[in-house]
C-alpha cells in the first residue's frame, strides 16, 4: 500500500535540502498530488536558500567589523523626512552577532502586512534598541536635515543604561558628531541588516504615532498616508486647515500659514 499524500506532505515539510534523497524517491510517484507537493517543497527550499543568501550579503559590513574586533554594532536609520506632518523618527538597533531575521529588509521593501511581525522579531532578538523622536516644531526651527541628526543622536542616547553599548555605528547616509566610530552607508537600509532593523523599528514606531494622530485630527488620512502629501491629505488641508502637527516650513503648509483666509 502506497504512502498517503498527506503523510508525504508531512515528510516533505521536514526536508531542508534540495539534495535530500526523498525528492529522487518521490520523482517516480505518478500521483498528481505528490508531484504538486514535491514541486511546492522544492520551490519553498529554493526561496529559503535565496533568503539566506540575501541576509548573508546584508551582513557583509557587520562581519568585516567583527573581524576588526568590534563587538556591538548599532544600525541607525530614520523615517519621516518627507511628510508634511508629524515627527521624524530615528532608531538605533544592536543585533546579536551574525543574527538573521527572515524577511528583514529596507522597511520600504517590506509589505505593510509584514511590518508588525518583523518589528516584533527585531524587538525580541535585539540586544538594545533606542528611539529618537523630533517633533514638527523643532523640524521647523532647525530644518529637516538637522532634525534627522538630532533624532539619530537621541536614539543613541536612549541606549544609555542598557546592558549593551555600541562600539561602532552603521548609519544610513549620514555622519554624526559623536565620539563613536562610524560609517555612513548610502542606501544602508538595503545593504546592512543592522540598519534595516533600525529602519523597521523607526517605521512602525512612526506609523503608530500617525495612526494615533489620525484619531485626534480626522480628515487628513494620517493613518494611511503617515503625513505624506497625498490627495486625501491635501484635500484635508484645504477643508480643515493646518493642525498643530503640520510642518510650517514645508510647502504647501508654509504658504497656507501666510494666507490670512486659512481657517
Curated annotation (Swiss-Prot):
Q: Which UniProt keywords apply?
A: Cytoplasm, Endonuclease, Hydrolase, Manganese, Metal-binding, Nuclease
| GO CC, alphabetical | cytoplasm; ribonuclease H2 complex
The note describing how and how many cofactors are bound reads:
Manganese or magnesium. Binds 1 divalent metal ion per monomer in the absence of substrate. May bind a second metal ion after substrate binding.
Listed GO biological process terms: DNA replication, removal of RNA primer; mismatch repair
Q: Reaction catalysed by this chain?
A: Endonucleolytic cleavage to 5'-phosphomonoester
The residues forming the signal peptide are none
Compartmental location? Cytoplasm
Origin: domain of life: Bacteria
Question: Which EC number(s) does UniProt give?
Answer: 3.1.26.4
Q: Which cofactor does it need?
A: Mn(2+); Mg(2+)
Protein family per UniProt: Belongs to the RNase HII family.
Per the entry, what this protein does is:
Endonuclease that specifically degrades the RNA of RNA-DNA hybrids.
Question: What name appears for this protein in its UniProt entry?
Answer: Ribonuclease HII
Amino acid at each position: 500500500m502506497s504512502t498517503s499524500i498527506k503523510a508525504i506532505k508531512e515528510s516533505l515539510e521536514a526536508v531542508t535540502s534540495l539534495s535530500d534523497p526523498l525528492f529522487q524517491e518521490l520523482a517516480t510517484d505518478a500521483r498528481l498530488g505528490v508531484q504538486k507537493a514535491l514541486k511546492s517543497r522544492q520551490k519553498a527550499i529554493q526561496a529559503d536558500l535565496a533568503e539566506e543568501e540575501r541576509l548573508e550579503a546584508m551582513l557583509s559590513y557587520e562581519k568585516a567589523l567583527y573581524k576588526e574586533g568590534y563587538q556591538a554594532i548599532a544600525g541607525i536609520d530614520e523615517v519621516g523626512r518627507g511628510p508634511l506632518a508629524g515627527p521624524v523618527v530615528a532608531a538605533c538597533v544592536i543585533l546579536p552577532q551574525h543574527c538573521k531575521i527572515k524577511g528583514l529588509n529596507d522597511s520600504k521593501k517590506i509589505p505593510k502586512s509584514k511590518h508588525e511581525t518583523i518589528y516584533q522579531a527585531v524587538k525580541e532578538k535585539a540586544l538594545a534598541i533606542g528611539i529618537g523622536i523630533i517633533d514638527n516644531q523643532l523640524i521647523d526651527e532647525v530644518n529637516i536635515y538637522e532634525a534627522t541628526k538630532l533624532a539619530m543622536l537621541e536614539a543613541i542616547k536612549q541606549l544609555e543604561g542598557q546592558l549593551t553599548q555600541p562600539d561602532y555605528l552603521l548609519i544610513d547616509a549620514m555622519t554624526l558628531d559623536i565620539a563613536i566610530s562610524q560609517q555612513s552607508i548610502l542606501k544602508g537600509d538595503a545593504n546592512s541588516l543592522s540598519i534595516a532593523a533600525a529602519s523597521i523599528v523607526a517605521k512602525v514606531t512612526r506609523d503608530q504615532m500617525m495612526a494615533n494622530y489620525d484619531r485626534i485630527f480626522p480628515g487628513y488620512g494620517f493613518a494611511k498616508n503617515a503625513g505624506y502629501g497625498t490627495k486625501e491629505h491635501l484635500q484635508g488641508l484645504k477643508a480643515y486647515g493646518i493642525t498643530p502637527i503640520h510642518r510650517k516650513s514645508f510647502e504647501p503648509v508654509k504658504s497656507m500659514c501666510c494666507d490670512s483666509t486659512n481657517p
